[in-house]
């Protein structure tokens, strides 16, 4: 049956084409000779044809015309689509260029020279609490990835940060590139650059760098001796909106020992080996300002006592560790966080916040816009199973706690 229908259709099509050709021939002959019929014009020739032939011819011509129109419309539609895509691409490119230009102009604008270090930092990178966490992961280490001195354990952690967070920009800086980035981002605040260059230990420069890169760019900073167990978006509890959070930190130590002062500066300390923050956050600004001020004081003390020269840490290993903690590490970081909590203008917290608020913390706690995680979240002792399924939902990062500053 289908073959019969196809043959019949083809036959009818041939008849219509033949009719059209005959009609055309009659018109031509009539026009040039006038000998076949007395009809003198085209209208007369057509009117002399039988009605059934005229109907078939009309249908055929209408069908062909409709087909041609459809093809033309399809071509126009494809052309329009191409033009719109090209236009969208140009607009996106222009928007990116405008952003870069605005960033460059912002860096070229100098804050007033008479302004305080805090005012200069605020001027350069103001805080927008309603912004999103930028999708950046920052790390630093004294050796590059291609250096044979790059520890294999650190290399595995570095690769896992990228693997577990495919939508994030992941950058690893060495000593030279970190220095270059700081000089670029803080060219309008020379006090910051000078303080960075004066710091006497590699680990102190790493500490300072993490605050500086997070303050300017936001995102996540992770020390090189960390290993991610879960993707970064898992850090935020389901019942908390990321827009309500300006920073995510964890507790580093929560001592109940009466001799805790021998090992650390504060009884409870916040970790700074992993931090997630929005750019321009006031806690980061205060940490940077205090480090700059401390370094400036130590520079003056060095000039007064020995006529200048490079700054140095004096003492045994434990004494040096405590001094580093007070200068750039966990102790100063903890003090700055508590200062923020207890400044109700900044934090909108109207009651005094002490270490007791976080003592033996087992679940995430939101204070102001700071999400504080328990010790196990960023210093988990969980080993990642082969199937990748972590039993403890709050185990986010392993921290090897390597004393990397010793080889500074």
Predicted features along the sequence, with ranges:
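Glycosyltransferase-associated regions of secretory-pathway enzymes
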Residues: 2-206, 222-408
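Small-residue hinge/turn detector
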Residues: 207-219
């Amino acid at each position: 049956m289908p073959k019969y229908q196809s043959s019949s259709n083809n036959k009818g099509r041939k008849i219509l084409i033949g009719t059209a050709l005959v009609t055309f021939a009659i018109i031509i002959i009539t026009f040039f000779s006038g000998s076949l019929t007395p009809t003198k014009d085209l209208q007369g020739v057509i009117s002399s044809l039988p009605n059934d032939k005229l109907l078939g011819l009309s249908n055929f011509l209408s069908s062909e015309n409709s087909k041609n129109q459809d093809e033309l419309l399809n071509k126009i539609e494809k052309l329009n689509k191409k033009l719109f895509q090209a236009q969208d691409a140009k607009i996106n490119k222009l928007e990116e260029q405008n952003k870069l230009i605005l960033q460059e102009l912002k860096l070229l604008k100098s804050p007033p020279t008479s302004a305080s270090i805090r005012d200069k930092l605020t001027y350069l990178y103001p805080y927008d609490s309603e912004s999103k966490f930028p999708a950046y992961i920052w790390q630093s280490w004294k050796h590059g990835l291609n250096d044979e001195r790059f520890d294999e354990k650190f290399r595995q952690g570095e690769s896992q940060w990228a693997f577990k967070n495919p939508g994030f920009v992941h950058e690893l800086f060495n000593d030279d590139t970190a220095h270059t980035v700081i000089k670029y981002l803080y060219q309008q605040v020379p006090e910051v650059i000078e303080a960075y260059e004066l710091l006497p230990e590699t680990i102190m420069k790493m500490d300072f760098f993490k605050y500086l890169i997070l303050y300017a760019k936001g995102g996540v900073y992770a020390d090189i001796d960390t290993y991610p167990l879960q993707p970064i978006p898992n850090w935020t509890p389901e019942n908390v909106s990321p827009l309500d959070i300006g920073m995510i930190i964890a507790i580093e130590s929560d001592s109940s020992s009466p001799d805790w002062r021998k090992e650390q500066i504060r009884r409870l300390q916040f970790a700074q080996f992993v931090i997630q923050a929005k750019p321009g956050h006031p806690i980061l600004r205060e940490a940077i300002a205090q480090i700059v001020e401390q370094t400036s004081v130590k520079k003056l003390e060095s000039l007064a006592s020995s006529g200048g020269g490079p700054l140095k840490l004096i003492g045994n290993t434990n004494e040096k560790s405590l001094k580093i903690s007070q200068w750039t590490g966990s102790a100063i970081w903890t003090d700055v966080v508590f200062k923020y909590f207890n400044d109700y203008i900044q934090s909108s917290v109207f009651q005094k916040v002490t270490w007791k608020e976080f003592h033996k913390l087992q679940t995430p706690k939101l204070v102001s816009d700071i999400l504080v995680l328990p010790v196990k979240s960023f210093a988990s002792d969980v080993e990642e199973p082969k199937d990748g399924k972590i039993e403890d939902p709050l185990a986010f990062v392993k921290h090897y706690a390597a004393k990397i500053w010793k080889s500074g």
